[in-house]
Amino acid sequence: MNFTEKENYNFNDLVEIVKILRAPDGCPWDREQTHKSIRSNFIEETYEAVEAIDTDDLDLLKEELGDVLLQVALHAEIESEQGTFDINDVCDGICKKLIIHHPHVFGDVNADTTEKVLKNWDAIKMKTKSQKTQTQAILSVSRALPSLMRSTKIQQKAAKVGFDWENVNGALDKLFEECEELKAAVENNDVENQREELGDVLFSAVNVARFLNIDSEHALYDACDKFTDRFSSVEKLANERGIDMKTAPLSVLDSLWDEVKLSKNY
């Protein structure tokens, strides 16, 4: 193996290390990996980087961004071995994309506000992707996105051609309507429609969040944290009072829940 260790490494060193790991005399595990086998790794590393951002942990962010870069380098190396493209092609593609998407910086287009920039981007994306209708633009939203995020993007694209409520009240009314339809499906034991109606409720809730300029992913993220914190306090309180949560009546647990809710002011 022809590799010299040194004090500080750069991106080119990362690419070289990945090549060594994938070589016949490299690492058996790395050699066996395919795009699909490390797909979940890519997602996991990305979410860990996002968590570092959310917790404002810069040391962790530096580490997690490195893990994300490793995934990029691995996927590029897999294709480099097949002769389809390599990491330089990846860099070339994104550089060209950035230049095309910023004609107000690299060209003579006037876009001196964020609104103008975003409008230009939409026009450029539709042109470069040969999208002639807004339906094509909506279909271009990745199906692999988390569903709340995908819902938001679909709604945003539909709104750009006027297919939208006038204000949040219309979105709220639709949410209440969908909740009633879900309630009816449950009461009628209409198992076939329950999933569909629940999906409509979630989609409508995302629409309300969009009108309120609330990131639905972040809102649900915070709700999960709030529930976890409150549940932990309920469990602690139950233990202090000798209450077995597994056998205690729901009314007792609900009372503990309300007590914790009042003590924490939420």
Regions found by a protein language model. Give the residues of each.
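Flexible "arm" and connector segments at domain edges
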Residues: 1-64, 70-198, 202-266
